[in-house]
Amino acid sequence: MPTPHNNAAKGDFAKTVLMPGDPLRAKFIAETFLTEPKLVNNVRGVQGYTGTYKGVPVSVMASGMGIPSIGIYSYELYTQYDVENIIRVGSAGAMRADLELGSVVAGQGACTNSSFADQYELGGAYAPICDFDLLMAAVESARELGVKMPVGNLYSSDTFYDAAGRNMRYAKMGVMAVEMEAAGLYCTAAYTGKRALAICSISDNLITGEELSADDRQTTFTNMMKIGLEAAVKMAQD
């Protein structure tokens, strides 16, 4: 059932979708890791693919940048395409000096400066968290792959350029890294009764000033991708 943002047919998406922000990263994941990937969506250049990984159907589709964008795509996948699990595989800026470029973190929770959750009229501050089963599948996968993956709080910012200098205030509260989508994804999963997890690779470090190139961000975050794919396999076995 196509939507204004997705021209895939019902049944074109697997139960688990890996969701990078970048359409080129979605293409890279599909062509590098999936067997017989099929392009199922290309509206607005937001490419979506479905194939298999180790015999398990898996889809990958870009979310675009920011909470409003991932809010649209995740909601439609959950409600129109019967997707059960969305694993965000994106980049993040480290708020700890010990997080090296290319290292992987998982967001157990995601605080935000966004008003996205206001739509639910909860009357308070909602704390978006990931799905525990998805998180454990990712943690086990990371251990099996020999990849160190700290688990903690992410900060989903509505702004990329931090004009007011507020990002580092979150670092003082133990937040590991800043990105722009996880909180919206977690809220949408909670509202629809589905599962979500954000796994992020460190593209730059706000403490040290180090950063990766745009090309490296598209194609070198393979540990994050493998963890997401292995987690998808584990979820299919449960």
Residue ranges and their predicted role:
Residues 1-128, 132-133:
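Metabolite-binding pocket within alpha/beta catalytic cores that recognizes anionic/polar moieties
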Residues 125-173:
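Active-site rim beta-loop-alpha module in soluble metabolic enzymes
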Residues 206-238:
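His/Asp/Glu-rich mid-to-C-terminal helical/loop segments that flank catalytic regions of hydrolases
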